């Protein structure tokens, strides 16, 4: 058994087939990029809603657009995604020799679509399921409607679909480790490619391709020159994004170290700083129509609150139904104007029930 384990961890180092640690590391790199950028945009939107609110509402679409530019640049230049190139890997057609330089057009487009669209669709599906689950928990939908039965069917089947999806990926990873499979991911199989290590010949070929592009750009027609300039501009945008992500990787490692157990004393000293005064626009007049005089009255419906619910972004308390519909429609707090999503609704349970 020990022989088998040693064989698994050492065979990949002697040939062009990457080890399981390399392929899993490159996948986790892009998986960590989206939550990190999402948190940064969230902080910006909460600090300045008027300027960054749109960026927060359309984050998934903007991130997908940047991801498309980034992956398109690296697939056309290095035959690999950004994370694969970061770890010295490239894509070749299944069954082809390791010396293959560029991906065929069919495999190129399949790789690009699977790299960009699958994560986007998965994030959107999870948001829809979470929203439907909240609506079901608090009986927001009409219990006799046809849509509610459809929602229940979706909520009942989603855990099994997710389990099947994860099991599909796990099977490919186990086959890659134990039986020397060609792919560690079914998405690579669907794209018709496999991963291999970059060689010195590949690096020299990339340099020559860049030199030839610069040489040919000086002896072409005006239309071709414009196309070349646009292509270089997109490449520059993708390169700047990739450089930012590379720096972000080291920044994430720094955050892991900063919030480790060894630095708890430092964090405690920082948390003991005095609380800053509230923003000026929070100091509303007592006669403001947004805030009723009685603390038990909902600011929206002007009735005694039912199912007290606070907004995590501002701290104001409303009826759950009032807060739910308002936040779902306007994506902001009705009193402070801070950007707010449904996940910021916090159900309150009083001691007297």
Swiss-Prot record:
Topology feature Cytoplasmic, residues: 48-51, 135-139, 272-353
Residues that bind Zn(2+): 298, 301, 319, 322
Compartmental location: Peroxisome membrane
GO biological process: protein import into peroxisome matrix; protein monoubiquitination
Peroxisomal matrix side: 1-19, 77-104, 179-243
Tree of life domain: Eukaryota
Pfam assignment, any one: Pex2_Pex12
GO molecular function: ubiquitin-protein transferase activity; zinc ion binding
One Gene Ontology cellular component: peroxisomal importomer complex
Major localization listed first in the record, in broad terms: membrane
Membrane protein topology class: Multi-pass membrane protein
Zinc finger (RING-type): 298-337
Pathway involvement of the protein, from the record: Protein modification; protein ubiquitination
Keywords: Membrane, Metal-binding, Peroxisome, Protein transport, Transmembrane, Transmembrane helix, Transport, Ubl conjugation pathway, Zinc, Zinc-finger
Xref: InterPro entries: PEX12, Pex_N
Segments passing through the bilayer: 20-47, 52-76, 105-134, 140-178, 244-271
Protein family membership: Belongs to the pex2/pex10/pex12 family.
Free-text note on domains in this protein's UniProt record: The three subunits of the retrotranslocation channel (PEX2, PEX10 and PEX12) coassemble in the membrane into a channel with an open 10 Angstrom pore. The RING-type zinc-fingers that catalyze PEX5 receptor ubiquitination are positioned above the pore on the cytosolic side of the complex.
Subunit structure and binding partners: Component of the PEX2-PEX10-PEX12 retrotranslocation channel.
Protein task: Component of a retrotranslocation channel required for peroxisome organization by mediating export of the PEX5 receptor from peroxisomes to the cytosol, thereby promoting PEX5 recycling. The retrotranslocation channel is composed of PEX2, PEX10 and PEX12; each subunit contributing transmembrane segments that coassemble into an open channel that specifically allows the passage of PEX5 through the peroxisomal membrane. PEX12 also regulates PEX5 recycling by activating the E3 ubiquitin-protein ligase activity of PEX10.
Protein name (record): Peroxisome assembly protein 12-A
Annotated source species: Xenopus laevis
């Amino acid at each position: 058994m020990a022989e088998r384990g040693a064989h698994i961890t050492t065979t990949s180092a002697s040939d062009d087939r990457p080890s399981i640690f390399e392929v899993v590391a490159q996948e986790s790199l892009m998986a960590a990029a989206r939550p990190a950028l999402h948190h940064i945009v969230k902080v910006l939107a909460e600090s300045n809603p008027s300027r960054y609110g749109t960026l927060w509402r359309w984050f998934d679409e903007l991130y997908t657009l940047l991801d498309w530019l980034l992956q398109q640049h690296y697939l056309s230049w290095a035959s690999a995604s950004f994370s694969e190139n970061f770890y010295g890997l490239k894509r070749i057609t299944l069954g082809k020799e390791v010396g293959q330089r560029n991906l065929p057009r069919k495999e190129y487009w399949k790789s690009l679509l699977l790299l960009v669209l699958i994560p986007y669709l998965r994030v959107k599906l999870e948001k829809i399921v979470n929203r439907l689950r909240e609506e079901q928990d608090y009986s927001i939908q009409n219990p006799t409607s046809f849509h509610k039965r459809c929602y229940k069917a979706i909520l009942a089947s989603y855990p099994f679909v997710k389990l099947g999806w994860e099991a599909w990926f796990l099977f490919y990873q186990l086959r890659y480790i134990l039986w020397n499979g060609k792919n560690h991911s079914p998405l690579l199989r669907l794209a018709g490619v496999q991963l291999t290590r970059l060689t010195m010949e590949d690096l020299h070929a990339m340099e020559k391709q860049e030199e030839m592009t610069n040489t040919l750009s000086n002896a072409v027609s005006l239309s071709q020159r414009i196309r070349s300039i646009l292509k270089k501009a997109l490449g520059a945008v993708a390169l700047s994004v990739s450089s930012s992500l590379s720096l972000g990787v080291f920044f994430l490692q720094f955050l892991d170290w900063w919030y480790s157990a060894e630095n708890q004393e430092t964090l405690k000293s920082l948390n003991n700083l005095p609380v800053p005064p509230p923003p000026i626009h929070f100091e509303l007049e007592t006669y403001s129509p947004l805030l009723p005089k009685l603390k038990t009255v909902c600011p929206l419906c002007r009735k005694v609150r039912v199912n007290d619910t606070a907004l995590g972004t501002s701290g104001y308390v409303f009826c759950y139904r009032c807060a739910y519909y308002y936040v779902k429609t306007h994506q902001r707090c009705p009193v402070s104007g801070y950007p707010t999503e449904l996940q910021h609704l916090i159900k309150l349970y009083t001691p007297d029930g």
